[in-house]
C-alpha cells in the first residue's frame, strides 16, 4: 500500500507531510492524523481490490476486474459481511461485481449509486444516498451503521471516483475508514475533509438493515 512518511508537527499530532497525488495540495491533509485510539472502529472485515485481479469482463478490449473497477462492490461486500455475518460469506467483491455485470449494471467504469443500492437490497440492506452533514455522519457511525462514501479527486483518488467505507469514529470525532484500494486504515479523517472531497452532490450512502 501507500507508504506514508509522517512527521510530528508542533502540535504533537502526526501529520502526513506529503500529498500522494501531484494535483492535490498537501493542505488537504490538514487534520488527518494517525488514529491513536481505534476503539470506535466497528468490527468490519477488511477486503482489498488487489486480491481479486481476475478479469470478469472485457469491454472495448480492456480487461475489467475487481482490481481495476471494483471499489464499489468491495466496499459493499465489507458492509454486507458486517451486517449479515456468516450468512453472507458468499458476498465477496468478485461475486457482487459478477452479479452487476450479469445484470447489465456495469458499463466499463465503476458502478453507479443505483447499482450499489440494487445489490444491497439483495441482502436486505436499506440505502439512502445523501449529501451528508457532519452531525448526521457522526451520529450514523456512532449508532453502529456504515456509510459508503463516493470520493472525488483528493486523498483517495487521483482524478476519477473511488468508493470507500466509513467504519467508525475516534473519541475526538474523526472518521475511520476501510479503503478497498489502500492501507490508509491507520488514519483518522475530519468529517469535513470527506465531505469536501465527495465526488457527487450526494456522495454518502447511509446503510442499515431493513
What label would you give each PLM region?
Residues 97-132, 142:
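Mid-length scaffold segments of soluble, non-membrane domains
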Residues 19, 23, 30, 36-38, ...:
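Noncatalytic regulatory segments and standalone regulatory/sensor domains
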Residues 1-105, 153:
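Active-site-adjacent structural segments surrounding the nucleophilic cysteine of cysteine proteases
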